[in-house]
């Protein structure tokens, strides 16, 4: 098996390097979101610009539902679990920041635990999501897109709400 030199001189196979990279990127997305949420008051977490738009709390509820459904018994069951009520994920029934963050942590713990258990020999294995076959790589990349989409929404809403009080999560613009 061909190896590549990864950061800090580690010798890894391509599959090992891929898994290490995606785990790192997902953890960065999680941390970025948490840094945005830390800047918000409880009421800001539940703010929505209109009835058709989702609050950060609802986006988090949806992400958690998706993570738990997709990554529980990942190799042996369809990623869309029969007990998942996706529509309920968009109901604003959470009232406290602690409830939101509990769901956030349940989702991420489920997802990252499953992701860390994948080995390179499983990357081309076929799994199903909504009765459609996907390789494990495709499933990971599907989630990379989905979670990044929602992380962007969360950060954008948080930045809008904080306005001039926003603390940049990356390199700030020069003023």
Model-derived features: where do they sit?
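Acidic/histidine-rich alpha-helical segments that form the ligand environment
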Residues: 91-127, 138-147
């Amino acid at each position: 098996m061909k190896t590549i030199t990864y950061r800090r001189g580690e010798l890894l196979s391509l599959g090992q390097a891929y898994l290490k990279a995606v785990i790192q990127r997902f953890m960065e997305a999680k941390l970025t979101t948490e840094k945005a949420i830390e800047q918000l008051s409880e009421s800001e977490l539940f703010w929505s610009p209109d009835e058709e738009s989702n609050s950060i709390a609802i986006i988090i509820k949806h992400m958690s539902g998706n993570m738990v459904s997709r990554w529980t018994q990942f190799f042996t069951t369809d990623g869309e679990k029969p007990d998942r009520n996706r529509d309920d994920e968009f109901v604003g029934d959470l009232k406290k920041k602690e409830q939101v963050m509990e769901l956030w942590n349940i989702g991420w713990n489920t997802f990252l635990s499953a992701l860390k258990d994948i080995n390179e020999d499983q990357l081309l294995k076929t799994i199903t999501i909504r009765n459609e076959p996907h390789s494990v790589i495709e499933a990971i990349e599907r989630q990379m897109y989905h979670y990044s989409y929602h992380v962007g929404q969360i950060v954008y809403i948080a930045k809008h709400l904080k306005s001039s009080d926003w603390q940049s999560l990356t390199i700030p613009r020069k003023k």
